[in-house]
Amino acid sequence: MAKIISFDEESRRALERGVNALADAVKITLGPKGRNVLLEKKYGTPQIVNDGITVAKEIELEDPLENTGARLIQEVAAKTKDVAGDGTTTATVLVQALIKEGLKNVAAGSNPVSLKRGIDKTTEALVAEIAKVAKPVEGSAIAQVATVSAGNDEEVGAMIAQAVEKVTKDGVITVEESKSLTTELDVVEGMQIDRGYISPYFITNNERQTVELENVRILITDKKISSIQELVPVLEKVARLGQPLLIIAEDVEGDALATLVVNKARGVLSVAAIKAPGFGERRKALLQDIAILTDGQLISEEIGLSLDTASLEALGTAQKITIEKDNTTIVAGNTTKPEIQKRIAQIRRQLEETDSEYDSEKLQERIAKLAGGIAVIKVGAATETELKDRKLRIEDALNATKAAVAEGIVPGGGKTLIYLASKVDEIKKNFDEEEKIGADIVKRALEAPLRQIADNAGVEGSVIVSRVKDSDFNTGYNAATGEFEDLIAAGIIDPAKVVRSALQNAASIAGLVLTTEAIVVEKPEKKAAAPADAGMGGMGGMGGMGGMGGMGGMGGMGMF
């Protein structure tokens, strides 16, 4: 495949054009008065969204050089989403401003490497400053964080706060689509473990790349399973019941895994397998936790139990199991409450006796997984388009809430970034001259999110930035009402983790763009043009379709 190579200023300008094309489409969604973006779908109805990451993912540019720039911004947005769960639009606006200011200075003769060093050192100092000013989140602040992130939807804010209260901050909260018109909160007992499917061939939902099983039997063992013969008795019993089966084992490999995959593909048995979580003694304890939660038994040779003699009573049960690439959620229902409480009490006693910080952390994690349960927010709406938009907003709000609980909160609405800009002059005192220019690039870029929030609200961004600069730490611009007020009191707050991640990821990619001297991309293939004079001939009649032979009987199940 032939390549296009671009150098120097030409390469950086191509990247900037790509960055601007994507960022301009994303940044109009920022703030309480952010506009919507309509996305055409190849199949189905167009989607109307107000979510930065969703817009960013949809954009692909025709020019391969510019598209490289766009993809860098997609990475900023995706990384921010992965780490903090929200703040993707803020990160996009920041990186666009950093690149714009930085490239001006590179074109004027500044050393890109020194600029990058200045940007990196300034960002590092500002991240420490965010940690200093962040306040712990408690009480009504949880609902306020969720409300702001959900586009000022107070119903969603209250629902997420309620979910956090019910399952504790250590519990698991998921968002699902509902068939009704209303959005509801449903709390069920459950556990999330950090192990995904052993083989992608177990996947049942191709769109989400997940395994989803309902009314499941669970085989829990600390053994490594390599021979299918060990599993045959259990598989036969479960196949007769017609229920899906989840196998949790040290590992499933060789012909055991191959046979399970083949029978799943043929539709003979709905089955999936995951590796047991943890290691050593902790693994056994976690498997015992899962057994108690699912009302099953840990099959271990240490207690005289083997796979080939396991009865159906030894298998755990779960209402629903969702297995992703890296984690598994088990919803067991409310069947074993007293046993769960006994187990939690036992772990708490261990927690009181341990002196090890590591052991203490792991024991608390186990209590959270047993006690926390799972809250499910079922999103309802009148149309599919509204449903998808509402679901995205709720997922953003949920992620923002988790981030707030993790690292605390700061004033929102771009105010914290303006405050950070005021600290840059102090930070850069010991920098060399070109590093100081890098620090100033960060200082100017930090104003961009507030400027954009104001522009989206239909007011002059420069005027708003100037007034907010002159106010105290908590006072900023409320774009929803057009007032300058105490943002914390008004409930306009951001999770510190979101602000930190947006700044770090934006600075990282901006530094890479500024120090880029060449781009190598694949040359697009030219599509063969149709012959100019070739009128389309009449379509020949379709021949009769031959009779379809009788379908052979389905073979017996391979493992029996």
UniProtKB/Swiss-Prot annotation:
It is found in: Cytoplasm. One of its GO terms (molecular function) is ATP-dependent protein folding chaperone. The keyword Isomerase applies. It catalyses: ATP + H2O + a folded polypeptide = ADP + phosphate + an unfolded polypeptide. It comes from the Bacteria. Its main location: cytoplasm. It holds the Pfam family Cpn60_TCP1. Together with its co-chaperonin GroES, plays an essential role in assisting protein folding. The GroEL-GroES system forms a nano-cage that allows encapsulation of the non-native substrate proteins and provides a physical environment optimized to promote and accelerate protein folding. Forms a cylinder of 14 subunits composed of two heptameric rings stacked back-to-back. Interacts with the co-chaperonin GroES. This is Chaperonin GroEL 2.
